[in-house]
Each structure stands twice: as C-alpha cells, then as structure tokens.
C-alpha cells in the first residue's frame, strides 16, 4: 500500500472522530445551558432589556377573528430611534406612512398626495395609545402568572427559548376591551432580547371574537436616522 495513502487512512478517521467529539461537546454544552434557564427569569430579563433599547426595527401584524372570519387591523413595518418613530404599511385597509418626531406627526395622505403635519400635543409616542407606533407597549405587564417553557426554536439564527404566559396587561384600553391574554414569546436568551412575540385575547363582549397580534424585532442598538420627510415629496 502506498505510504501516503496509508497516512491518509489514519488521518481521515482521526479527523472524523475529532469533529464528532467537538459536535458532541457543543451539543452537551447547549443542553446544559438550556437546562439551567428559568423561563420566568429569562422573560423578565428580556422585557427589562427591551425597554432600554435605544433603537430597533420592527414589524407588527394585528387582526381579529369573528366566527372564523379573519379581519386585518394593521400590517406595518417600522423603526425607532430614541423618541423618533417611522412606520409604513397598512392600517384598517388604508395605506399609512407616518413619522413621529419631537411631538409632531407627519402623516402622508395618499388621496391628496400630501404630507399632513399635526402637533400631537404629547411628549412621547406612548401617549398616543397607538400600538403600531410603540410595539413595546404590548409588553407592559402588571402581573405575570406562571411562565411555561414550551420549547426551543431558532429565530434569525438565534437559539430562542419559547415561553407561554397569561399576564395582566398595563394598557387600560386593552384591558377594557379584551380578556384572557395569552402570550407566546421567543427569547434570545444569550442577548436577553425578544425577536418575536404573539398574543391572543378574547373580546369581553363577544366570546366568538379573538384578537391576535404578532410582533417581530431586529437590529437592536443599530444607528438609524429617522428624519422628517420633505413635505413636497411623495411617500417613499
């Protein structure tokens, strides 16, 4: 047998064994880390960290189901940096392109093809009670009942802990209209962020009406320049 070939016969199995050993060690390490995660602790850490994020991009899709008939409330994508927000998409079957900067709302009117400028009279987008402008408002809880670990899933390349809980929400508007809130929250436990969440709730006056909101978050802490639109320009 060729000596070089003999050497390769020795090297290749050895390399395979090393690779298998490394993969096994990685799997064992991941299993160990996962097994030590407390879902309630990880959820609170992620909520606190999300509240302190200076910037992020997001998507929000909301709707309700009445007797198995699906109605869309909104489908928007947006970005936030400090107190400034920009969203674009559709709300109640109407195109929306909206900025909130320095207490001023810039809303593109698709009918007149003009930007409308409105003094909101508020110091924060949170005061506008529009979930699409402040998606984190959906994660303000008064109390959280038992947090259940569901499984692990990969979201955008991140290993995420999926948890389920039934909190009491802080939003008086939400509480006045809906009940039996159930949240599914994907936690990137390595960075204490929430890349995805889904909530459902039942209507207080109609048991056959269910609310659903799905939110996605990304690009945490990235620099974004959200500037007022040029009023003579069209919506981009």
List where the protein language model places each region.
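An acidic-aromatic
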Residues: 75-132
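Solvent-exposed loop/turn segments connecting transmembrane beta-strands
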Residues: 66-70, 91-97, 205-207
């Amino acid at each position: 047998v060729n000596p070089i070939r003999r050497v390769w016969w020795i090297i290749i199995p050895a390399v395979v064994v090393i690779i298998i050993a490394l993969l096994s060690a990685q799997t064992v390490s991941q299993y160990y880390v996962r097994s030590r995660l407390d879902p309630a602790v990880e959820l609170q850490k992620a909520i606190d960290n999300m509240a302190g994020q200076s910037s992020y991009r997001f998507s929000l899709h909301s709707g309700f189901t009445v007797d198995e008939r699906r109605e869309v409330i909104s489908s928007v994508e947006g970005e936030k940096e400090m107190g400034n927000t920009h969203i674009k998409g559709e709300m109640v079957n109407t195109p929306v392109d909206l900025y909130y900067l320095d207490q001023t709302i810039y809303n593109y009117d698709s009918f007149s093809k003009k930007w409308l400028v409105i003094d909101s009279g508020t110091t924060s987008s949170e005061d506008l009670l529009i979930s699409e402008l402040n998606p984190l408002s959906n994660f303000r809880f008064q109390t959280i009942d038992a947090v259940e670990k569901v499984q692990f899933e990969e979201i955008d390349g991140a290993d995420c802990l999926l948890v389920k809980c039934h909190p009491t929400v802080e939003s008086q508007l939400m509480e006045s209209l809906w009940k039996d809130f159930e949240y599914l929250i994907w936690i990137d436990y390595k960075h204490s962020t929430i890349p995805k969440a889904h909530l459902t709730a039942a209507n207080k006056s109609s048991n056959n009406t269910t609310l659903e909101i799905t939110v996605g978050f990304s690009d945490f802490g990235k620099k974004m320049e959200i500037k007022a639109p040029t009023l003579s320009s069209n919506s981009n």
